[in-house]
Regions:
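Glycine-/charge-enriched secondary-structure boundary and capping motifs
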Residues: 3-153
Length: 153
């Protein structure tokens, strides 16, 4: 990426950033365990998906029964800027970005619809950003990412 984009790791992460590209790429992983344990105490969680390599589809599919699909709506959460920078610098198609990176959703919790708003509140109270990003519907064990134009909280 550095060669293709003609970027130096010590340069600003993006125009106006006050930290380097290297610092952004080496940002430590978020530890979700305490917040997810609290969520499990407060809400009947059906499943957790830790989104690592394989992106959202590759990790969420592991917790889906064969009779359900997960519909995830892009644009309802705040994607960290580094992902658009990587995509632009590498001319990476949307589909590849979705299958490689977590795009800012490091942990997904599947909860009953009636508990969803409370789940968001619990996770936010634990110090993490949280959004309602989709729903579970009848299906065949697939993850489908859809688009929404503007982020919402």
């Amino acid at each position: 990426m550095f060669d293709r984009a003609q970027r130096d790791p010590s340069s600003a992460a993006w125009p106006g950033a006050h930290h380097s590209l290297a610092a952004e790429l080496l940002r430590p992983s978020v530890i979700y365990a305490p917040a997810m344990l609290e969520l499990a105490r407060e809400v009947p969680v059906h499943a957790f998906a830790h989104v690592t390599g394989g992106g959202i589809p590759g990790n969420l599919v592991r917790v889906l029964p064969d009779r359900c699909d997960a519909l995830v709506t892009r644009g309802v959460w705040d994607e960290p800027r580094i992902f658009s920078e990587i995509q632009q610098a590498g001319a990476v198609p949307d589909d590849e970005m979705e299958h490689v990176f977590n795009l800012g959703l490091g942990m997904l919790a599947i909860v009953p619809p009636e508990a969803a708003l409370h789940a968001v509140d619990v996770v936010r109270a634990a110090g993490h950003d949280a959004w309602l990003v989709g729903e579970i519907v009848d299906g065949h064990g697939r993850v489908r990412l859809e688009r929404r134009a503007t982020p919402r909280r």
